[in-house]
Amino acid sequence: MVLRSEILTKKSELPTPDQALPGRESAMPVPEAHFVNGRPLTAPFPAGLQQVLFGMGCFWGAERRLWQQPGVWVTAVGYAGGYTPNPTYDEVCSGLTGHSEVVLVVYNPQETSFEQLLKVFWEAHDPTQGMRQGGDIGTQYRSVIYTFDAAQKAAAMASRESFQAELAKAGYDRITTEIADVPPFYYAEAYHQQYLAKNPNGYCGLGGTGVCLPA
C-alpha cells in the first residue's frame, strides 16, 4: 500500500478508503443559475434531458468546451469517483480524496447525441496520460467517463476501442480513461463554476492529440 505521505508528494497514486480525508455532511453552496445561459445548475432538470460526467483534466477548460456544444442544456463542475464526501478544492488537490475533477453535462438528446459528446470528449484531451493531463499532474486530472445508464456505458466503451485504434496509428500509448457507473457527484465551489466565462484570460490546460474519432 502506498503511504499517505507518498500520495501527497508524488500525486500519482489513489488513496484507499482508510487514507481518504473525512469530508463533511454539508454540501457546497452553488449558484442557482449557470453564468452563461442562466439555466439552473442543480436538479431537478426538465423532463427528457440526459446527463453524463466527463473528466478530462482541469475542469475549467473542459467545462467551457462542453457548454459550447449544440444540444448541451447546462454544465457544472465538481468532483466524483473518490471517497471524501463534499470535498473542497484544496482537499481534492491534496490527492487524499480520490476524486477526479469532472463536468456534469446535461444535454437534450433531441438536439445532440451521446456519441457526438463522446467525440468532443476524446478529441479535446489526451486520454493516454494516466494521472495527469499535460502540465497538470495529480490523480484529480485523470480521464474518466461516468455513465448514467447501460446504453451510455456501452457507447462509451465502444468509442474507447474505436479511438484507441486511431491513437495507435498515430503512435500513442494505451488509453487510461476509466469508464464506470456514475458515483456520487459533489459540486465544486461557486468560483469554479463557468470559471472561464468569468475570467476569459484564465488558465486553460485543455489540449487534444490531433487524432479524430471516426464517425
From Swiss-Prot:
| Keywords, comma-separated and alphabetical | Oxidoreductase
Record GO terms (molecular function)? L-methionine-(S)-S-oxide reductase activity; peptide-methionine (S)-S-oxide reductase activity
Mind telling me which residue stretches traverse the membrane in this protein? none
Summarizing the function annotation, the protein's role is:
Has an important function as a repair enzyme for proteins that have been inactivated by oxidation. Catalyzes the reversible oxidation-reduction of methionine sulfoxide in proteins to methionine.
Q: Which family does it belong to?
A: Belongs to the MsrA Met sulfoxide reductase family.
Q: What is this protein called?
A: Peptide methionine sulfoxide reductase MsrA
Q: Which GO terms describe its biological process?
A: cellular response to oxidative stress; protein modification process; response to hypochlorite
Q: Which domain of life is it from?
A: Bacteria
Q: What is its EC number?
A: 1.8.4.11
Q: Which InterPro entries match?
A: Met_Sox_Rdtase_MsrA_dom, Met_Sox_Rdtase_MsrA_sf, MsrA_MetSO_reductase
Q: Where is the active site?
A: C58
Question: According to its UniProt record, which reaction does this protein catalyse?
Answer: L-methionyl-[protein] + [thioredoxin]-disulfide + H2O = L-methionyl-(S)-S-oxide-[protein] + [thioredoxin]-dithiol; [thioredoxin]-disulfide + L-methionine + H2O = L-methionine (S)-S-oxide + [thioredoxin]-dithiol
| HAMAP family per record | MsrA
Q: Which GO terms describe its cellular component?
A: cytoplasm
Q: What class of enzyme is it?
A: oxidoreductase
